From Swiss-Prot:
Pfam family of the protein (one): CRCB
Keyword Nucleotide-binding: no
Keyword annotations of the record: Cell membrane, Ion channel, Ion transport, Membrane, Metal-binding, Sodium, Transmembrane, Transmembrane helix, Transport
Protein name per the record: Fluoride-specific ion channel FluC
HAMAP family: FluC
Main location: membrane
Length: 128
């Protein structure tokens, strides 16, 4: 029964994260156009920032239970961030001759995601 409860916790978080990613993609396409996958980039950067913050905060805090941490990280952040979409969009750009955009997409997604995990960790240390 415990494993089923944990699966439901992750599933609910995944639903919320994936829904948020969808809304971010709609917002990005409307506001930034469709020439570059800004929605995926924003979702990945936001997810990196939040997971860095949550993981750092939860190390020394009793405020986040193990179930809440699972809900937030594996669930919401797992549904929000998307390596498969990033990979597909990058390959599509590269195979369609958009080498510059494809390389920019790789650099921005990987570089910003790594950077924002560190920023999230530092924010958690500063705030808590």
């Amino acid at each position: 029964m415990q494993k089923l409860l944990l699966a439901l916790i992750v599933g609910l978080g995944g639903f919320l994260g994936a829904s948020l990613r969808y809304l971010i993609s709609i917002f990005a396409a409307k506001n930034f156009g469709g020439n570059f996958p800004y929605g995926t980039l924003i979702a990945n950067i936001l997810g990196a920032l939040l997971i860095g913050f949550i993981m750092e905060f939860s190390m020394d805090s009793a405020l986040i239970s193990s179930n809440m941490k699972l809900f937030l990280t594996t669930g919401i952040m797992g549904g929000l961030t998307t390596f498969s979409t990033f990979s597909y969009e990058t390959i599509s750009m590269l195979t369609n001759g958009n080498m510059t955009l494809g390389i920019e997409n790789i650099i921005l997604n990987l570089g910003c995601s790594l950077l924002f995990v560190v920023i999230g960790q530092k924010l958690a240390r500063i705030l808590f």
